[in-house]
């Protein structure tokens, strides 16, 4: 019998969509060349919309929501990643058109992954999460335009 793992799955219904807690197996994972054992994910505004169906965030059904995650590579056909590597993902349509971080595992394209920065745990990376990453990009853009805190 195939090993299973827990997941939240958004499924299409006559009335819109439903969120269910299910057990999946590797054969249920979407296409990709890296399989990651998900350790942490976050709950972002977009995730809330996807979970409730309040906005059409999910574009493919059934789908595991979760626009980001951090975890450990389980298997890889991408030469940049090996089993045991710690990685982070955010963006790339994950949680919208490709299954995301609200499952025990995710299979994604290696181009979408970033090695976990040294000195950070997967938990710490997701404590910052997509919202923190977005905020930092905004700060960097301000700095690139010469704006300083004292301005």
Say what each PLM segment does.
Residues 1-6:
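Eukaryotic N-terminal low-complexity, Ser/Thr- and Lys/Arg-rich leader segments
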Residues 11-15, 41-43:
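Short polar catalytic/cofactor-binding loops
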Residues 15-25, 54:
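Short glycine/threonine/proline-enriched tight-turn/helix- or strand-capping micro-motif at secondary-structure
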Residues 27-43, 54-94, 100, 112:
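Glycine-rich beta-strand-centered segment in the early N-terminal region that forms part
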Residues 90-151:
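NAD(P)H dinucleotide-binding glycine-rich loop of Rossmann-like/cofactor-binding domains
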């Amino acid at each position: 019998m195939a090993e299973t793992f827990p997941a939240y799955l958004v499924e299409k219904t006559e009335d819109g969509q439903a969120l269910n807690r299910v057990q999946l197996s590797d054969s249920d994972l979407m296409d990709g060349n890296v399989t990651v054992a998900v350790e942490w994910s976050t709950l972002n505004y977009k995730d809330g919309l996807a979970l409730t169906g309040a906005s059409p965030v999910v574009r493919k059904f059934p789908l595991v929501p979760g626009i980001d995650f951090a975890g450990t590579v389980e298997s890889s056909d991408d030469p940049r990643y090996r089993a045991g590597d710690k990685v982070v993902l955010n963006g790339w349509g994950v949680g919208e058109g490709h299954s995301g971080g609200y499952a025990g595992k995710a299979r994604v394209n290696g181009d979408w992954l970033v090695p976990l920065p040294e000195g950070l745990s997967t938990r710490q990376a997701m404590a910052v999460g997509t919202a923190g990453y977005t905020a930092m990009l905004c700060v960097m853009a301000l700095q690139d335009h010469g704006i300083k805190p004292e301005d």
